[in-house]
A protein has these predicted regions:
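Accessory alpha/beta interaction modules
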Residues: 1-162, 170-172
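Short, charged alpha-helical interaction segments and adjacent helix-coil junctions
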Residues: 2-7, 80-85, 181-284
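Generic structural signal for hydrophobic core residues of well-folded globular domains
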Residues: 25, 38, 167, 187-190, ...
């Protein structure tokens, strides 16, 4: 693994990095390999993809739009929305479902139609874990479909959501077995690597490490990447600030609630997780 002070390869969690590796015609073999690794047991092999317009407008003026990181169609007509989710956000699942409707609605032709739909897949690469320990600590790949809640039978198999909880993936280089393992390792660790791991000698990774090496970029590409990296850092800084502010506000509310209950400053401090001095400043 790399010295954290250096960076040889781009960070795929940045907008520039993700689209450089997966969102260009030149690198579509990387996207094909990644998607095949996700569905090797449940879907026939993808041999080609065609990139589609990643920006979608609503049906009428003023309707909300959706902008996907990567949107493509496979050789068998299936549509894939691939999203890199930097941080947890409210109503993430609702947003994911909403985005999938664009890939469904655009299939409706003008004129007569029998309602036949091609498969729609939404792939979410999550740089966070689902809240409240929703899934076991060792389960980081989730494949979701519409199912009967009584017998778990698949009711509709043409709408699929795959979510990857990246922070849960902790396999070392020596533990990588499947192509899925290798792609997860790359996504999790690429920007921290100084050398190509011996476990990643498959031909497709020749292309990946070539395209990910910052030293080979033009001056313009380097500037674009640095700007994208700055946006990535700013985003996390803003999120951390918001969380600290929310936590502080929660403690203040706790202080006044405990005060109304008649507790002493010492008891309030213990209950709110603050010092006695901080409590006294708040309650006067």
């Amino acid at each position: 693994m790399a010295d954290e002070r250096k960076e040889r390869y781009i960070n795929p969690y940045t907008d520039f990095g993700f689209k450089k590796l997966f969102g260009t015609e030149m690198n579509k073999e990387l996207l094909i390999s990644f998607l095949n690794s996700l569905f090797c047991e449940t879907k026939k092999e993808i041999t080609d993809v065609r990139y589609l317009n990643s920006e979608h407008l609503g049906d009428g003026y003023g309707d909300r739009r959706a902008v996907f990181d990567v949107y493509c169609m496979t050789d068998d007509g299936g549509r894939f929305i691939v999203e890199m989710q930097k941080a947890e956000q409210d109503y993430f699942k609702d947003r994911s479902l909403y985005y999938s409707t664009f890939a469904i609605r655009e299939q409706a032709p003008k004129g007569e139609w029998d309602y036949h739909l091609d498969d729609v897949y939404t792939v979410g690469i999550l740089n966070f874990m689902f809240p409240d320990n929703e899934y076991p600590a060792d389960k980081y790949r989730h494949e979701i479909q519409l199912k009967d809640t009584e017998d778990n039978h698949v009711f509709y198999d043409k709408l699929t959501f795959v979510y990857l909880e990246m922070p849960k993936f902790n396999l070392t280089e020596d533990e990588l077995v499947t192509m899925f393992d290798k792609w997860m390792f790359v996504l999790r660790n690429l920007s921290r690597l100084l050398d190509r791991p011996k476990a990643l000698q498959d031909r497709v990774f020749d292309k990946l490490f070539e395209q990910a090496e910052i030293a080979k970029y033009s001056d313009a590409e380097r500037r674009q990447y640095e700007e994208s990296k700055k946006d990535y850092w700013d985003y996390f800084s803003t999120m951390k600030t918001a969380k600290r502010k929310a936590k502080k506000e929660e403690k203040v509310e706790t202080v006044f609630r405990l005060k109304e209950m008649g507790l002493t400053p010492e008891q309030i401090a213990q209950g709110a997780g603050l010092s006695i001095e901080e409590v006294k400043k708040l309650i006067g």
